[in-house]
Amino acid sequence: MPRENQKRGRRAAEKAEKDAAKRKREEVPEDSLPKRLKPSTDESTEINQGADYIPFDENYNENYDGNYDENQADAPAGDMPFYGLLDPEEQEYFSRANEVLELNQFQDAEERRIFIDSVYKEANGKELKIACSQGCSRLMEKLISMSDMRQIHRLFNKFIGHFMNLVQHRFASHCCETLFINAAPGVTQKVSKSKSDKMDVDEEEGEEPEPELSLAEMFIKVVEELEGNWGYLLTERFASHTIRVLLLVLAGEPVDVSANDSVVASRKKEKLGLPQGETQDGDVSAQKRSVPDVFEATLKKIMKDIVSVLDDTYLRALATHPVGNPVLQVLVSLELSHFGKSSAKDPNSITRRLIPDESFEEGSETTTFVRGLLYDPVGSRLLETIVRCMPGKAFKGLYKNFIRDQITSLARNITAGYVVLRVLERLGKDDLQNALERIVPQVPSLLERSRMVVPKVLIERCLVRGVDTAPLARALEEAYDKDPARRLEQILRLESTTQEDLEESEQKPKGPNAAPSQSSTGEKLHGSLLAQTMLTAPGPISGLIYSSLLAQSSESLVKIAKDPTASRVLQQALTVPTSSAQFRRQFAPRFTSHLKELALDSSGSHVVDALWPATKDIFFIKERMAQELTQHEMALRDSFVGRAVWRNWAMDLYKRRRGEWAMKAKGIDNNNGSGERPKSRIELARAKFAAKAEEDAKKGAQKGVTA
């Protein structure tokens, strides 16, 4: 009798159960299935779960509201409040308004103000929808940046009561950040309506009343809304940057998002592209401000609440957390710089909990923690902040017992090297001399691996502290080719980039929008910065660059001038105080017969502009260059950068009033307002001798009278 065709075993049973479950899911109607948001794949939120990684417990904070899931991307859509969607007509209107603001073709500021008022009227009642909209949230950011304080005051009032949800939203969190930054200057002001504004309000029916709360009180309301959730918001991917801005605003510290070393916003943050000078407050956000007294007490309470819900282990784990680390940097800098370095003595302070032992003895818990931060790409940024702000006594212990003996190996490391830079900035003359002697033998290997930041900072600090740079100059000379022309190509990475471009063009065709590799661009930038720093040092270090520039042919100089990164070196060499008249007399004529080509180039035009002050004391060369520019007047006037060169060289004055142009070219009208010719050295000596003789004559007359 044949056996039944039956599969046996554990794997077969598991497969049968999966098939049954799959059939059940297919039979369920699609509408009854809960919809879930797509998980985020942002690389910035991925955490390397190594041996030193401690995950944050979801239920760690007892005060944390359980309705907010740690990963908002994986949470059901119903967990976050839904403020509604804009109608297609509304989306089209706000998209066109965004385009109008980007074009910025308003006749004057009054026309722009009227347009912004009309957009606010159209957005009345839809502010939360716009802030949470992917396409229109950028418009909200631009509106806030271009609004006056009264409009910001009203918008802030609309957001009150919703900040806990908005700061966690992918798009609305950026609107909150922009709102905090632009509202910060008004916390000490009382928003008063002018008579014209009051008349407009009386004429228009249905005008919304002015908010009863001041901006300072509104910031306190925001803190009250977020209270009890600080421990969770520290590591929330969207709320983190908004919390940083809020802390800095409460402290009255500068909130400069555009700075390269800013911890306020991510480097991937999209720029709004606002025209220069179109914001209401200009660069107020980059300045320190006075704040109400209640802000300082509120800030202290926030910092206390943040660290009270975390024990020492989790606080140190936050130091290597990619989202929580920038917030910790802000907290440490505020604790040490805003409240004073004496606050670090408090055993409950953040700094003391991170670094309890200031002696940094080998094998201690503090030394192990600091060593882990040194080589961690995320943690090293916190260590930079600690080194920059920590008290002098603690810094001396860190340097003498931990960093001094291994500063050479730390400088070679690509991550720890940045901490070494912060250490060099705080060293005194004797310690800097000792560090220079240790690092100088490693300079050739550092430059070979494109680690140019350490030699650059060494030069800067030696100039500040008055340390002899001759050993560093010899090390730099040994690191590069003996041929001066080749030396400059190696420093600026011109030779390597040319070879890379040739190899890439042979291997694969480039698209029209293909960009150069990030590594080569970074190397060129650091090489240019190193060369510019070398030019500021008097003596043999700057001589290495000057001799290399004189060894270049005119064609290679034109090529360097048209390079956006390398052209900065030429501008510096023409205008820096170490540039002698003898060098400029030999160097400036190399650009003649190439001025048209350079003036029409976006980078080369800046070199032509630098030739104007560089030839102040060699008038015959400047006059020859002006004649060459005159021959290509039409080509220069047809170009945007060419018109800038024509204006900076005062060529209209050259054509019409040659005598006045000559006085301006020699720098005579810049020395004094009367337009008098500056005295020569022999004339100054004669005047000094005459004044001394007159003084002696007066003294002799006085003696005769007394006798």
Swiss-Prot record:
Region Disordered: start-end pairs: 1-77, 268-287, 497-523
Family annotation (SMART domains): Pumilio (SM00025)
Pumilio repeats: 122-157, 158-193, 365-400, 401-437, 548-588, 590-627
GO CC, any one term: nucleolus
PANTHER family: NUCLEOLAR PROTEIN 9 (PTHR13102:SF0)
Entry's family note: Belongs to the NOP9 family.
The protein's name in its UniProt record: Nucleolar protein 9
